[in-house]
Amino acid sequence: EAAAGKLTEGLKSLNIAFYKRNPYGDHKDANEALIADRQALTAEIQEAEQEAGDLRREERREYLKNSTANYIAAFINDIDSSVNTPCIPTGFNKLDIALDGGLYEGLYVIGAISSLGKTTFITQAADQIAKAGNDVLIFSMEMARSELMAKSISRETYQLTLPKGETWKAKTARGITAGKRYQEYRQEEKEVIYKAIREYAAYAKNIFIIEGAGEVGAKQIRETTEKHISITGRRPVVIIDYLQILSPYNERYTDKQNMDKVVLELKRISRDHKLPVIAISSFNRMSYKGEVKEEAFKESGTIEYSSDILIGLQVKGADKDINITEEKKKNPRDIELVILKNRNGATGITLLYSYNTLFNHFSEI
């Protein structure tokens, strides 16, 4: 028994497959079993050899299932099914061209320094996606639902008045929500607000905002996404605002370990349900000056490697010695979008936007 135990430990340490069987029955060893009944011992050993061979063959069959050849049919089926799940345009035409049509299944991470407009950019894209008839599921960790709604309606007032050069009628988010100000508005200003609300209501049915009250982490994002698919039968574009304030995956993990687990889980959600997941990320303090780079993303290791698309926003001229604080005071601001990584397309593409901070609006230049 002791010898068998030592052999077992030795085989385990060498990672050699084995199984245990006692062919001796109640006899103390093989010699005693042979003397007692040669025929029975021989049959027992032959059966053990047969069983070992069967187990080995089964192990081989299981391993060979990993051969890529076994997945060709599934691969072809995925191509066929993609006809019913085409890419989803963001509504920013130049960005869609750079992304080969729009959003596909995968993990998209977009980052920028504080207060540069990353949430506004993504929520404008979300509105444009919803306008086209697609569902959008937004996990908002900081902003309340009412804040996001006010920003969208403010943007609608700007878009309604821009063609005729009447943007003086457009209203900021605060101008929308501050009821006392309505006493001072002209009737035509109020009509713009009411029309903007109607415009927003027409596509708001496709937008689902989950506020970050309580513990919202990767597990809750998966559960909510799966519930949405189960109830509506539609795969949404999932947006997380933002990564670094999601609930920790494990309280005992370091910040980096938690970020690694969260990013990997978001990647799995996109893969398991064949949908785009967009995560907004903050930058580390060391990256507040100079051009945007992959290593700028806070706790960036897994973000950099696991994301399918990595996008950075920066003030135009960030490669030069500019005063970021002064640039942030401008309205509109010239903002550059840089595609830092694209697993299935071109990288290094830079797109220029005009960001109207008053009315939460990005336009491509």
Where are each of the predicted segments found?
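C-terminal anion-handling pockets and recognition modules
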Residues: 339
